[in-house]
């Protein structure tokens, strides 16, 4: 297929397939690429190519993930699929594959199962904002009433976890039949279902805000004093844009301070502005070097606040991944590595949980010894003696 087809003028969206094991996530991923490849919008990816996902390391955690890309008439998509349940959990918690939306695959022969529930909960906790449902294997269910029952069950389950169950598009079809049809060179009723699914994804999952359109935030990595000019803080702009003349806040560790940007530099050249992804030095007016330390963030005023207490969804590494060899208990006090610094904190386990084993994922409450700029969705590593023993994401700010 001609490479020119991938023209980047279309808006880009990251999605993924989620759902219970053997409900057809990987088959659906293959079917989407097969059906769209017939329209010249994707390269045909075989099921086995997707299922033999390469292992990647994200924050020291090994995750098997397949990434495929395709287009619809309206958009360019990057689609992530994981072969194993544990890979999903790790992927969603570490943010290795950020999802702007997800396709929840449910076999109509089984209805929602344990991992269906777990993936919906994880999507809610880690901030996957939109879900579209594909009811798979409808060719294997003779009674349409049974399919309706499954549909109602799915809506209720989504509502239980705070998703708008009645508004979420539910598309019925068969991934396997669509894949067979497309491979045989046909465009039949099953392929049409895949196109219906992609239309729903196009219209229901909004195009995400670009990083440069978000509020400015830069984690501070280093601080220098330039005689006669003031204090320079360096770091990689995480989101937004910073311009000379902007009023900004220094947030975290110490009481919040307000200051003014008097210069932005990159590679020793002066710039008018720095944007998301740039490694910059920002010159601050009237800020003393001792007022700033690594671990603070430079941010648009009032856009982020310092906190010490939060709930989080975490994955604890196995021994094989270089994690702990033993469980931990209530009041465990590791370091939480947030953006650029380690902060000690204590962990409270949920009621009824006595200990957490390596390889578990669990919801915890954390209290840090000093405040850090945090918001829902902030990711962190849990470290002990410089080694990563876990990975997490803030699901709720408590104080």
Curated annotation (Swiss-Prot):
Keyword flag Ribonucleoprotein: no
Region (G4): 136-139
HAMAP family: EF_Tu_B (MF_00118_B)
Keywords: Cytoplasm, Elongation factor, GTP-binding, Hydrolase, Magnesium, Metal-binding, Nucleotide-binding, Protein biosynthesis
PANTHER family: ELONGATION FACTOR TU, MITOCHONDRIAL, ELONGATION FACTOR TU-RELATED
EC number of the protein: 3.6.5.3
Subcellular localization(s) per the UniProt record: Cytoplasm
Function comment: GTP hydrolase that promotes the GTP-dependent binding of aminoacyl-tRNA to the A-site of ribosomes during protein biosynthesis.
GO CC terms: cytosol
Binding locations of GTP: 19-26, 81-85, 136-139
Enzyme class, spelled out: hydrolase
Protein's gene: tuf
Source organism (scientific name): Campylobacter hominis (strain ATCC BAA-381 / DSM 21671 / CCUG 45161 / LMG 19568 / NCTC 13146 / CH001A)
Region (G3): 81-84
Superkingdom, taxonomy of origin: Bacteria
Pfam families xrefs: GTP_EFTU, GTP_EFTU_D2, GTP_EFTU_D3
The name this protein goes by in its record: Elongation factor Tu
G5: annotated segments: 174-176
Residue span, tr-type G domain: 10-209
SUPFAM superfamilies: EF-Tu/eEF-1alpha/eIF2-gamma C-terminal domain (SSF50465), P-loop containing nucleoside triphosphate hydrolases (SSF52540), Translation proteins (SSF50447)
């Amino acid at each position: 297929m001609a490479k020119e087809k991938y023209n980047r003028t279309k808006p880009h969206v990251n999605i993924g397939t989620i759902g219970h094991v053997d409900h057809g996530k990987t088959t659906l991923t293959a079917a989407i690429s097969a059906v769209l490849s017939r329209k010249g919008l994707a390269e045909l990816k075989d099921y086995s190519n997707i299922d033999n996902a390469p292992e990647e390391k994200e924050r020291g955690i090994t995750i098997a993930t397949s990434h495929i890309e395709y287009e619809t008439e309206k958009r360019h998509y990057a689609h992530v699929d994981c072969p194993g349940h544990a890979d999903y959990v790790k992927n969603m918690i570490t943010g290795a594959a950020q999802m702007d939306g997800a396709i929840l695959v449910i076999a109509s022969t089984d209805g929602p199962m344990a991992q269906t529930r777990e993936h919906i909960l994880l999507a809610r906790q880690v901030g996957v904002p939109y879900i579209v449902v594909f009811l798979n294997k409808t060719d294997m269910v003779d009674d349409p009433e049974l399919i309706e029952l499954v549909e109602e069950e799915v809506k209720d389950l989504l509502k239980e976890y705070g998703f708008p169950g009645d508004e979420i598009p539910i598309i019925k079809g068969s991934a396997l039949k669509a894949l067979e049809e497309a491979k045989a060179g046909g465009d039949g009723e099953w392929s049409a279902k895949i196109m219906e699914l992609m239309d729903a994804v196009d219209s229901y999952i909004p195009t995400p805000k670009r990083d440069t359109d978000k509020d400015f935030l830069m984690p501070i990595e280093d601080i220098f004093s330039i005689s006669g000019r003031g204090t320079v803080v360096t770091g990689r702009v995480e989101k937004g844009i910073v311009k000379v003349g902007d009023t900004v806040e220094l947030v975290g560790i110490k009481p919040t301070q307000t200051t003014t940007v008097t210069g932005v530099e990159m590679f020793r050249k002066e710039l008018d502005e720095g944007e998301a992804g740039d490694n910059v030095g920002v010159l601050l007016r009237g800020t003393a070097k001792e007022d700033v330390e690594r671990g603070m963030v430079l941010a648009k005023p009032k856009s982020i606040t310092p906190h010490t207490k939060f709930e989080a969804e975490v994955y604890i590494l196995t021994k094989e991944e270089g994690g702990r060899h033993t469980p931990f208990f209530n009041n465990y006090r590791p370091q939480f590595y947030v953006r650029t610094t380690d902060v000690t904190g204590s962990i409270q386990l949920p009621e009824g949980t006595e200990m957490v084993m390596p390889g578990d994922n669990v919801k915890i409450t954390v209290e840090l010894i000093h405040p850090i700029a945090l918001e829902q969705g902030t990711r962190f590593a849990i470290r002990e003696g410089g080694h990563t023993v876990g990975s997490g994401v803030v699901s709720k700010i408590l104080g």
